[in-house]
């Protein structure tokens, strides 16, 4: 599902533990780390997509997390030209994302990366809240910064910039 401007609706997930650290996951087959994220399917609300992606990508169920906050609006990033498939119709030029801050309320052993076929991630770790800003691929960095700044005041443990 791509909107009239060429952006694919998507949800981004910042999952925090009791210490204010966030889940940082490595994409399978790549040396690229990111927050879990995924597309919103036709007829889904952002919250429904959030819970579907949470289950598919990291094995968590709604009862394993608490929604703390979400971004007020959509945050957009454009894909680099090398990632744009100009032969597709419609052409996707980027993602528009609704970001959610979640608190893990279950033991971390519930996190499972192997439920999707194929899996999205092959490794994960807890990192400090601001660590991802220096690590994420450049074209996503501005959206990460905007989402993290907007959501940081709602963290279970304060992690102000």
From Swiss-Prot:
InterPro entries documented for this protein: Nudix_hydrolase, NUDIX_hydrolase-like_dom_sf, NUDIX_hydrolase_CS, NUDIX_hydrolase_dom, RppH
Motif (Nudix box): 38-59
Segments traversing the membrane: none
Cofactors named for this entry: a divalent metal cation
UniProtKB keywords: Hydrolase
Enzyme class per UniProt: hydrolase
Residue ranges occupied by any Nudix hydrolase domain in the UniProt entry: 6-149
EC number: 3.6.1.-
A Gene Ontology molecular function term of the record: pyrophosphatase activity
Superkingdom of the organism of origin: Bacteria
Gene3D superfamilies found in the cross-reference section: Nucleoside Triphosphate Pyrophosphohydrolase (3.90.79.10)
A Pfam match: NUDIX
Family listed: Belongs to the Nudix hydrolase family. RppH subfamily.
NCBIfam families (UniProt xref): PRK00714.1-1, PRK00714.1-4, PRK00714.1-5
HAMAP family for this protein: Nudix_RppH
Protein task: Accelerates the degradation of transcripts by removing pyrophosphate from the 5'-end of triphosphorylated RNA, leading to a more labile monophosphorylated state that can stimulate subsequent ribonuclease cleavage.
Annotated protein name in UniProt: RNA pyrophosphohydrolase
Organism (species): Acinetobacter baumannii (strain ATCC 17978 / DSM 105126 / CIP 53.77 / LMG 1025 / NCDC KC755 / 5377)
Lineage start: Bacteria, Pseudomonadati, Pseudomonadota, Gammaproteobacteria, Moraxellales
């Amino acid at each position: 599902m791509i909107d009239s401007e060429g952006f694919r609706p998507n949800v981004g997930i910042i999952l925090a533990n009791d210490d204010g650290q966030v889940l940082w996951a490595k994409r399978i087959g790549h040396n690229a780390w990111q927050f879990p994220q995924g597309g919103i399917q036709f007829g889904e609300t952002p919250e429904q997509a959030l819970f579907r992606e949470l289950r598919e990508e990291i094995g968590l169920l709604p009862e394993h997390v608490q929604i703390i906050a979400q971004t007020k609006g959509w945050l957009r990033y454009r894909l680099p030209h090398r990632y744009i498939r100009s032969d597709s119709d419609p052409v996707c030029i980027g993602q528009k994302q609704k970001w959610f801050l979640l608190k893990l309320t279950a033991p971390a052993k519930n996190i499972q990366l192997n439920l999707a076929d194929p899996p999205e991630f092959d490794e994960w770790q807890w990192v400090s809240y601001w660590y991802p800003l220096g690590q994420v691929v450049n074209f996503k960095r501005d959206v990460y910064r905007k989402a993290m700044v907007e959501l940081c005041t709602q963290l279970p443990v304060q992690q102000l910039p």
